[in-house]
Amino acid sequence: MAINFSPKVGEILECNFGNYPVSQNGQFSTTYYDGRIPPEMIKNRLVVVLNGKINGNACIVVPLSTTRDHDKLNRGMHVEIASNVINDLQFFDQQIRWAKADLEQQVSRNRLNRARTYRGYLNQCLPHELVADIQRAVIKSINAISLIN
């Protein structure tokens, strides 16, 4: 169920990014512009909220992934989140994740919901230091590092 509140900076939510449209030959369509196109983010995944008050119905989020990209990690565009930082969830294993700051985007609150735990729903924010690392990684990914040096 979609959220009906303004999430806090650093809050962990689940986002349904949708999927790629498939053409008649079974391949992902790269010319259908009313949906996602590779390599854009897809599927249900955890996200970190960076701004929950864009307007009445939008948030800026950074998706979390269990796939490490050594190159982007070394370039400071991905931030490692240790396996014990995010509480145990029903549909997401407790494991190392990476905040993919190069995939930061604005999404509708209709795409966002609280992730399920075994006894309800997750209500958790990342530590401030980790959120600051993710924010710096977003700045690096948009090639604006000179603004903070």
Language-model regions, residue ranges each:
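Compact nucleic-acid interaction/catalytic patches
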Residues: 33-44, 49-87
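Short, Lys/Arg- and Gly-enriched loop/turn segments at beta-strand edges
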Residues: 20-31, 37-38
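C-terminal terminal-subdomain/extension
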Residues: 2-5, 73-149
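Intrinsically disordered, low-complexity acidic/polar segments
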Residues: 24, 56, 70-71, 108-111
